[in-house]
Amino acid sequence: MEIFEKAKPILDRLIKNGFEAYFVGGCVRDKLLNRTIGDIDIATSALPEEVMSIFPKTVPTGLQHGTVLVIQNSEPYEITTFRTESTYYDFRRPSEVTFVKSIEEDLKRRDFTMNSIAMTTKNEIIDPFNGTIDLYDGLIKCVGEAKERFQEDALRMLRGIRFVSQLDFRLHDETFNAIKSNKQLIENIAIERISVEIEKMLIGKSPKKGIELLIQTNLVNHLPSLKEYTNQFNDLLELPIQSLKTIEEIWALILYKCNSDNPEQVLRNWKMSNSRMKQIVKIYNLLNETKMKWSNTKLYQVGLPDAIKYERLQCVINHIDANEFNENSLKNLYNQLPIYSKSDICITGNDLLEWSQLKGGPWLKEVLSEIELQIVENQLENNQLAVKEWFINWLQK
């Protein structure tokens, strides 16, 4: 069933109870653009407590902002009361929210015209700020005064640039100039929120457009760990980065171009998780090695996914589209490995202890590592008889 059809009974129920209800925001925008639709957002004239009285399964996720989560057929739907927002404090949050009865008033508080479009259950469009025109013109334009929108929530500056990259759009002149004159406000925003927008921008359809705007508006000089590397960040524009598939590849490339002495600290400044940081630094370190020759041991140690990322990045660094890299030869080499991890080895440390009648110690780890290496390099068959014979010879040395 189409996603709007599944949500339609919720709006019908609100309307049946005497309230207005509309689809709003990103879901309407993406429908008009024929893009994949994520979450469905619903706006209504019903107050939060009225919404909760109408539906049997609700979660009061943000009552102070008028938001209630309604569970319908095991699907969660966010329903928010029409509202206006007063003066913002700390360039992030409104100091006061006022519930209103007009959808037009509600749409007025939103960031960009393309996100200020509402739709009825009959697919009728309510568009007081001509968002559909801007949408079809490929234009990111603020609702009302751009400067005011960014002073309300400074993250909107990055959201605008992120949308340029994701949709391959362009910024309206007033929106661009307002970002340029309010760029320093981004320093009031939590790095976790900034990171989400930057990463969506970097893996968008047109990441170069996004990077170019970060530089042109000078926003880049107010982002952690990037202001020292503006020139190197600019170098990314010369490379076919749009051909990279994962955010880990892109972060490794950024670190490589910046020639960072302390990549862990750079990523830590972006509040990266330890596991993710470890993966990115691994790829970064591979890039700093001499041109890789894929022996059995090297491919076994690196693993196929990271080996492919490395080769794709080598293409991009050499100004070649990453999609030119043919993964099949690397996959074939990997598939011929006798084992893929330690757990594939046919014996354990307990076997060695039993065969040798020795006590455990540092020697055990060393011998297991040597057996692993011998098997990977096809110098030793991965079966108990062969390994036992090799081990007895080792004991006699």
Residue positions per predicted region:
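Catalytic cores of the polymerase beta-like nucleotidyltransferase superfamily
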Residues: 1-397
